[in-house]
């Protein structure tokens, strides 16, 4: 496509196989210099910007950018660098055509990486889906920059990366979604207490999931429920479309809330759907916002007005547990 540059399949395959033989050590200056040489790239001496090195790759997508660990991070790790980013696809095409082309290329590259690396350890999305293969020293990430840029391949220092991401979560500086095949110990984001802010955050998560999960061939479900499993719950299922459900099994005085669900936009249970529900035709911003409001309104109808009374369960169709600190409420996993 005019206005795009990309690695060939052979170039990408050769690079991925070389990566499996390269040692990054402790991610110090000597380690990075040696690793860049082993990749067949030429390191440009001197910083191209504050905290950045540059390596000429010989690819038409351009140089690789090597990022130092920011001094303000104050990490326990002694690594001096934490990320090397290379564009697999560099795209200047705007609009829907550009977005569709970047998505197609991302899926093609993902297929090659699955062949070479096997199943990923972590998947997620923030401005486009990303996939990670992790070992204790090196994490390899493929990221679709959906709205601009193209498709990037990032080589990440595992320990510094995870410390920096944990610090960001504790500050509340986080967005998007993450799904783990094996969930590690993870920090909680500062709690959200305002229902309006929570609804906006939930809407953002649903927008991200609706755009991302079809690209990585899965589906996602987010459940909001009381921590005592009182049968008061709502859920959103993202599977190429968007569906919300509200429990039909609430008990006692809370059953009075069922009388409000029709007015909130829910359809009554049927043979195929035992819960109150509504399906949206797409996962657009408007649909996600409406879905989030319907979920929160149903919780209120069930007598839940305090976010401290609910937790979230979230998972993909492939069995991965999703981690959504952006919601600002506890996960069900953290309560066990």
Which stretches of residues belong to each language-model region?
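Short helix/turn-capping signatures at newly exposed starts of structured segments
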Residues: 1-267, 271, 299, 304-336
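Residue-level preference for long, well-ordered alpha-helices that form the structural scaffold
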Residues: 98, 102, 284-291
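Short, intrinsically disordered low-complexity segments
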Residues: 267-289
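Alpha/propeptide regions of enzymes that mature by internal proteolysis
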Residues: 294-295
């Amino acid at each position: 496509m005019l206005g795009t540059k990309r690695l060939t399949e052979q170039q990408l395959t050769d690079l991925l196989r070389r990566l499996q033989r390269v040692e990054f050590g402790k991610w110090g200056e000597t380690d990075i210099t040696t690793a860049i040489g082993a990749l067949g790239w030429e390191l440009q001496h001197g910083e191209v910007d504050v905290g950045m090195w540059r390596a000429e790759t010989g690819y038409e997508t351009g140089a690789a950018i090597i990022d130092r660990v920011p001094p303000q991070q104050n990490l326990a790790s002694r690594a001096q660098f934490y990320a090397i980013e290379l564009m697999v696809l560099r795209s200047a095409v705007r609009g829907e055509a550009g977005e569709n082309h970047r998505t197609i290329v991302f899926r093609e590259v993902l297929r090659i990486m699955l062949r070479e690396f096997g199943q990923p350890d972590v998947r997620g999305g923030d401005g486009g889906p990303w996939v990670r293969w992790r070992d204790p020293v090196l994490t390899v990430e493929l990221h679709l920059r959906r709205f601009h840029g193209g498709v990037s391949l990032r080589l990440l220092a595992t320990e510094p990366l995870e410390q920096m991401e944990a610090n960001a979560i504790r500050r509340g500086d986080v967005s998007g979604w993450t799904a783990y095949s094996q969930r590690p110990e993870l920090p909680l984001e500062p709690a959200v207490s305002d229902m309006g802010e929570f609804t906006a955050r939930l809407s953002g998560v649903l927008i991200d999931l609706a755009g991302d999960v079809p690209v990585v061939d899965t589906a996602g479900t987010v459940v909001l429920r009381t921590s005592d499993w009182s049968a008061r719950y709502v859920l959103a299922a993202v599977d190429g479309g968007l569906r919300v459900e509200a429990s039909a099994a609430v008990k006692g005085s809370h059953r009075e809330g069922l009388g409000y669900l029709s007015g909130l936009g829910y359809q009554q249970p049927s043979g195929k759907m035992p819960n109150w529900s509504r399906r949206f035709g797409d996962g657009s911003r408007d649909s996600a916002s409406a879905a989030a409001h319907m979920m929160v309104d149903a919780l209120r109808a069930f007598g839940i007005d305090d976010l401290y009374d609910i937790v979230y369960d979230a998972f993909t169709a492939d069995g991965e547990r999703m981690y959504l600190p952006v919601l600002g409420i506890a996960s069900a996993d953290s309560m066990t």
